[in-house]
């Protein structure tokens, strides 16, 4: 997991909550990659003992203060803010990971099931999804990087093992980040904001011989990534692995459907929504992990 705080969003605390969920549902060690400022803030605010209970390793990397990457963050359809989005380290995950097999998970992809346990001992060296869906979608679908560009792969969850394929993929992602303007022109997408999703999509396309047919990279052994968009909200955390969302209706801004998810992983993209319920999540999963430890 990566966590780099900005002026308003405490990614470190979100990562702590998700680490407890990982330990409960996947029962594997968790390593956090962060910067010293974020780590110092997290340990001061939450307590070193609690932080140590969440993570087996914390790897501190230098934060590139010259990296400027601004994006709009929404808290439902009623509030949007422009904030710094420090997401430039994923390409280094291959070298930084202390494991032979790694699940690279965004801190806000909440692990509420054991579904990703199917990844271990896979015959594939790398797995990453291009299929996504929301609670209101009848079936998963695929997007493109831009209207006339290549298939979009989501770097929200990536499985990889030590292998030449994985090493080449992550090395390419680092090169794409360094030369993002060139690749933006080459692949005909308009946004100048750096996205790991875009960088991995380009790298996969290149490794596949600049071809989208018969991709060299397999998808994760799940139906698709379940997305709760930043226009949605959280109604309540009912219990362990049990959440109820306000899911905004398509093309009906501000109109919601209550959606209950149980034993289902979900990418919660409204960071303020998860922050409003973070203490409840920590309380529930901290208690259950302590019980299981004894």
Give a label for each model feature.
Residues 1-3, 11-17, 32, 40, ...:
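A glycosyltransferase accessory/donor-loop signature
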Residues 39-97:
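Active-site-proximal specificity loops/subdomain of glycosyltransferases
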Residues 29-37, 60:
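Short beta-strand/loop segment that forms part of the nucleotide-sugar
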Residues 86-136:
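GT-A fold catalytic core of metal-dependent nucleotide-sugar glycosyltransferases
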Residues 21-28:
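Short, acidic, metal-binding catalytic loop of nucleotide-sugar glycosyltransferases
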Residues 26, 53-54, 98, 122:
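Short, structured coil segments at secondary-structure junctions
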Residues 129-149, 287, 291:
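A short, conserved beta-to-alpha structural element at the edge of catalytic cores
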Residues 22, 94, 158, 200:
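A residue-level signal for conserved active-site and pocket-lining positions in enzyme catalytic cores
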């Amino acid at each position: 997991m990566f966590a780099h705080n900005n002026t308003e969003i405490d990614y470190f605390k979100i990562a702590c909550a998700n680490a407890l969920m990982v330990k409960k549902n996947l029962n594997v060690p968790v390593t956090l990659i962060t910067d010293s400022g974020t780590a110092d803030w997290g340990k001061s605010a939450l307590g070193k003992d609690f932080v140590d209970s969440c993570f087996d390793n914390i790897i501190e990397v230098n934060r590139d203060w010259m990296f400027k990457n601004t994006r709009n963050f929404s808290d439902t359809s009623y509030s949007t803010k422009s904030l710094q989005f420090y997401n430039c380290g994923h390409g280094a995950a291959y070298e930084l990971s202390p494991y032979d097999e790694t699940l690279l998970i965004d801190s806000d992809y909440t692990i509420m099931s054991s579904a990703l346990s199917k990844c271990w001992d896979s015959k594939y060296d790398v797995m990453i999804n291009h299929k996504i869906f929301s609670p209101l979608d009848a079936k998963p679908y695929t997007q493109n990087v831009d209207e006339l560009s290549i298939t979009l792969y989501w770097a929200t969850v990536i499985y990889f093992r030590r292998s030449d394929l994985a090493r080449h993929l992550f090395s390419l992602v680092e090169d794409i980040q360094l030369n993002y303007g060139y690749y933006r022109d080459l692949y005909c997408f308009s946004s100048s904001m750096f996205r790991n999703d875009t960088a991995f999509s380009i790298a996969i396309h290149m490794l596949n011989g600049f071809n989208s047919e018969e991709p060299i990279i397999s998808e994760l052994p799940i139906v698709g990534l379940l997305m709760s968009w930043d226009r949605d909200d959280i109604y309540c955390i009912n219990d362990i692995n049990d959440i109820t969302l306000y899911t905004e209706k398509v093309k009906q801004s501000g109109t919601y459907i209550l959606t209950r998810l149980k034993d289902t992983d979900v990418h919660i993209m409204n960071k303020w929504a998860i922050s409003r319920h973070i203490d409840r999540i920590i309380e529930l999963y901290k208690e259950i992990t302590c019980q299981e430890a004894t």
